[in-house]
Amino acid sequence: MSAGLDQETGVRITARQLGASRQAPAVARQFTRGFLADMGASTWCQQAGELMASELVTNALVHAESAARLWISVADGIARIEVTDDGPGDPVLRDPGPAGGYGLWLTDMLAQSWGVIPAAGDRGKTVWFTISLSGSRQFTSRLVS
């Protein structure tokens, strides 16, 4: 898997446009895990990163009814993973229930930090999270307002 390198900042970047199909979460998992592995991430970071990316892509498909764009950057041992969609409204962190609600909840528990960037206009947003490449298991709320 190849990544771009910003020569000025040393940030490694890769992105993938995902279709609005049932295969998108699986593609996101494979893409995320592969890139994190190429960057030397710990097994835990690879697993947690692919899980959170998959959940956020699933949220885009289910709630935004939109294709998603997955963007990953790595700098100074930290990966930032973003999922952008064209759906209206912001996601809401809630307690999971029998019918779902695990996406943001898992992200809140596993990520170092996370947040939402509204798009200009009435539709669209980017949900992002950060995770340490050398990270290990951690369970704490990390929402950045």
Region annotations inferred by a language model:
Residues 1-17, 61-145:
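Conserved beta-strand-loop-beta-strand hairpin that lines the nucleotide-binding pocket
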Residues 3-6, 24-30, 41, 75-76:
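Short hydrophobic/aromatic-rich motifs at helix boundaries and adjacent loops
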Residues 26-54:
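Conserved short strand/loop->alpha-helix "switch" segment adjacent to the catalytic nucleotide/phosphoryl-transfer site
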